[in-house]
Amino acid sequence: MYQFLNLLVKVTIRLLKDNPAKGSENMPSRWLHERKTEHYYNKAKVEGYRSRASYKLKQLNDEFKFFDGAKRVLDLGAAPGGWLQVAGESIEGGLVLGVDLKEIDDLYMENVETIVGDVRDPAVQEGILTRFQGEKADVVMSDMAQNVMGVWEVDDLRQIHLARMALSITDRLLKEDGWMIVKVFQGKEHEAFIREMRAMFEQVFIVKPLASRKGSAEVYVVAKNLRKDRTIPEDLNSEGELQSFAEEQEKEPLPGENLPDYGEPEEYGKKKPS
């Protein structure tokens, strides 16, 4: 599937460069204006959180209480650190560990540490277990996202790819009675991914926090208790993918890129989490 996805991305890049959508050159500036007037963006600035996504995690935890009693929390794709801040405030003692390809500026929280690296790298995974003193995580959470292309079909597949990657990693690093929180889009692969989650976990919930933008296709899947007889999707852990995804992070923005919450197609616009 990845070879197909990689080809699709390359074709889309060429189409966008040769035929940019009408008005697309203004999309980033429009998004920035809307973002800066948005309630949770301004609230994060006032309250000292690094991103508006902090409030999504707060709202999810208010509902599910996954931080209650947690001592080891792993945040995948943790930059810029908004989820690390919330987790660090929410657990007593223990350790919150964030992993990202980019270096995360110091949060000055005693129970929060970070690792620069790719969590799919076995050496990084061993480093995580070492930091957790040989124990697995009580909570694994992933708000991972790549710069969007502005092309729904491509962005949907890329986001599901990240979610499946997080699921594979969670299988190795989460305690059997632990929690997983992961972001997905309500797109073509959404239902298939939910089936995969249910094959992995005994309890699976689909939630859209109030802090998510109204026009966003994103939802969060919250799951608890790994099944003893679980099955996981195809492992997406090849060395080639490590390199190609790292390279994608360094690409020059395309017209319409960096719009993480554009409106979804109409068939998904009225769809509610189930």
In which residue ranges do the predicted regions lie?
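Glycine-rich helix-loop-beta junction characteristic of Rossmann-like nucleotide cofactor-binding loops
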Residues: D62-D68, R172
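Mobile active-site "lid"/loop adjacent to the S-adenosyl-L-methionine
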Residues: G117-V119, F132-I181, K188-A192
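Conserved S-adenosyl-L-methionine
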Residues: E202-S212
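Conserved class I S-adenosyl-L-methionine
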Residues: A70-A79
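Conserved SAM-binding loop of SAM-dependent methyltransferases across substrates and taxa
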Residues: P80-I91
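SAM/dcSAM-binding transferase cores
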Residues: P28-K43, S51, D62-F64, K214-S274
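S-adenosyl-L-methionine
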Residues: I104-G134
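Conserved SAM-binding motif I beta-strand of class I
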Residues: L95-D100
